[in-house]
Design a protein with these regions (language model features):
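Extreme N-terminal, non-catalytic leader segments
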Residues: 1-10, 33
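Conserved lysine of the Walker
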Residues: 21
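P-loop (Walker A) phosphate-binding loop of NTP-binding proteins
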Residues: 14-16
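Post-Walker A alpha-helix
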Residues: 24-25
Length: 132
């Protein structure tokens, strides 16, 4: 396969809340800076230190529902009263241009993404107990 035809891969990271997904991804990015991390949309309020467009796209319920209803999300879920969604177009663009991308999403979202991109998806799931 020529470099021109190479498709990017999706690395889907899923684990329970607080298991260290974000820390694992940050370490991976330090080791492999060619990876891109997908930025999700959420309706929750920003936490201290989180940056718009880097950590998340912070939107209200109406904006989220508009994106969802227009088919803009590859996957979406509700967790602890907040909505989360992965925009389809940046993921498709990364795959098309041969760039690897990391998605930090829940288990159900991972299943949905693997259905859309079965050949490009690498699924990584862990529990904190497995690491120690």
């Amino acid at each position: 396969m020529t470099e021109e035809n190479k498709k990017g891969r999706l690395f889907i990271v899923t684990a329970p809340s607080g298991a260290g997904k974000t820390s694992l991804i940050k370490a991976l990015i330090e080791l492999c800076p060619q990876f891109k991390v997908s930025t999700s949309h959420t309706t929750r309020k920003p936490r201290q230190g989180e940056r718009e467009g880097i950590d998340y796209y912070f939107v209200d319920n109406d904006a989220f529902n508009t994106l969802k209803n227009s088919g803009e999300f590859l996957e979406n879920a509700e967790c602890h009263g907040a909505k989360y969604g992965t925009a389809k177009s940046p993921v498709e663009e990364s795959i098309k241009t041969g760039k690897d991308i990391i998605l930090e999403i829940d288990y159900q979202g991972a299943i949905n993404v693997k259905k859309v991109f079965p050949m490009q998806s690498v699924y990584l799931s862990f529990h904190l107990q497995w690491l120690f």
